[in-house]
Amino acid sequence: MEDENTTIIMASLSALSPSHLTNLTHSILSISHHHRRRLGAVLSSPTLFSLTLRHLLSLSLPDKTHLIANHLLSLLHPLLIHRKHHSSYAVTMKLRDLDAVVLLLFLCETHQLHPDVLEASADNWREILGNTYSNNMLSNNSGLWTCDAGILMPYIETLVRCKRFVDIMGGYNHLRRRDQKEGYQVPAARAAVVALRAVEVFNVAASNAGEVECVICKEEMSEGRDVCEMPCQHFFHWKCILPWLSKKNTCPFCRFQLPTDDVFSEIQRLWEILVKSSELHVA
């Protein structure tokens, strides 16, 4: 599964133009620096480490899953920001949650590479993890981070690990919700609805070479009135589309998906876009 996810991401990156790849690399470098600074701050402060670890240990497994899912969503955002008609909105995490997730991921990485390290008393974890972090930083400063591969590969590895965890934990719970209610739908994100364009019917008819019908109510759109234009360039009465989008994030005509505030559905939406872009590149 990890190899498949890595292949999808790499194929999607290969489809980018040089300028888009450069912009993406700069964005990822900025994000990575921010995450490393937060992890360094947690490990260097006894008080902050204690508070962050306590917060992390207080979270249930579903809460940890949601935490990692939000982190994954924030990592996916830079990959989609340049894609036309496929908008995504940057995820803003509380500082306490960001500190918790970067510490959690570092604990998992440390346990995977050095299983015996965390068998020590938790009172010694900050010192042990701090030394491990310092050694990693010294290794990274050898020049690896000056090339695109050195910036992208750690990002891809983190993204794939988070995706795998969410697929196992969050995906299972998400499928259960779908099974509980056939035809399960999620509403469109409020920000996505607010961003929809208002277009005059005269201009709509001109661009479509004739009269336009709202497929929700099956009535023609009155000339001179403002109607809603979806990113897929389909048009609807505002009074029809707003109730629709309060329940479903899809276009009534073509099933184009708007962003949603449901974290697991949004991950699935963005991942499907990446899969399609990778398939087009391979084809």
Swiss-Prot record:
It is found in: Plastid, Amyloplast. Pfam families: zf-RING_2. GO terms for molecular function: ubiquitin-protein transferase activity; zinc ion binding. Coiled coil: none annotated. A zinc finger (RING-type) spans 214-255. The keyword Membrane does not apply. Pathway: Protein modification; protein ubiquitination. It catalyses: S-ubiquitinyl-[E2 ubiquitin-conjugating enzyme]-L-cysteine + [acceptor protein]-L-lysine = [E2 ubiquitin-conjugating enzyme]-L-cysteine + N(6)-ubiquitinyl-[acceptor protein]-L-lysine. PANTHER family: E3 UBIQUITIN-PROTEIN LIGASE PRAJA (PTHR15710), E3 UBIQUITIN-PROTEIN LIGASE SGR9, AMYLOPLASTIC (PTHR15710:SF67). E3 ubiquitin-protein ligase which accepts ubiquitin from an E2 ubiquitin-conjugating enzyme in the form of a thioester and then directly transfers the ubiquitin to targeted substrates. Modulates amyloplast dynamics and sedimentation in statocytes during inflorescence, hypocotyl and root gravitropism, probably by regulating amyloplast interaction with actin filaments (AFs) in endodermal cells. This is E3 ubiquitin-protein ligase SGR9, amyloplastic. The gene is SGR9.
